[in-house]
């Protein structure tokens, strides 16, 4: 080995068989991209709830 780097937890979570995780259920490697539907659904739900909560907070002004 020429060099070794200790990975932190976030970096370890992004390793998926040489693919890059974009944190929303989308993964890409050199050949293709794909979606993990369970992760994607959770990410979209979080975005929707966050937007809904922000709009409610803004209604009080």
Curated annotation (Swiss-Prot):
GO CC entries: extracellular region
Keywords: Antibiotic, Antimicrobial, Bacteriocin, Disulfide bond, Secreted
Disulfide bonds: 28-33
Propeptide: 1-18
GO terms (BP aspect): defense response to bacterium; symbiont-mediated cytolysis of host cell
Key word Disulfide bond present: yes
Subcellular location as annotated: Secreted
Regions annotated as coiled coil: none
Entries under InterPro entries matching the protein: Bacteriocin_IIa, Bacteriocin_IIa_CS, Bacteriocin_IIa_dom_sf, Bacteriocin_signal_seq
Chain's role: Has antibacterial activity against Listeria and Enterococcus.
Family: Belongs to the bacteriocin class IIA/YGNGV family.
Protein name: Bacteriocin carnobacteriocin BM1
Annotated gene: cbnBM1
């Amino acid at each position: 080995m020429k060099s070794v780097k200790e990975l932190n937890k976030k970096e370890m979570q992004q390793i998926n068989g040489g693919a890059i995780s974009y944190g929303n259920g989308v993964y890409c490697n050199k050949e293709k991209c794909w979606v993990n539907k369970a992760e994607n659904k959770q990410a979209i739900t979080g975005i929707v709830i966050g937007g809904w909560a922000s709009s409610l907070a803004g209604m009080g002004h």
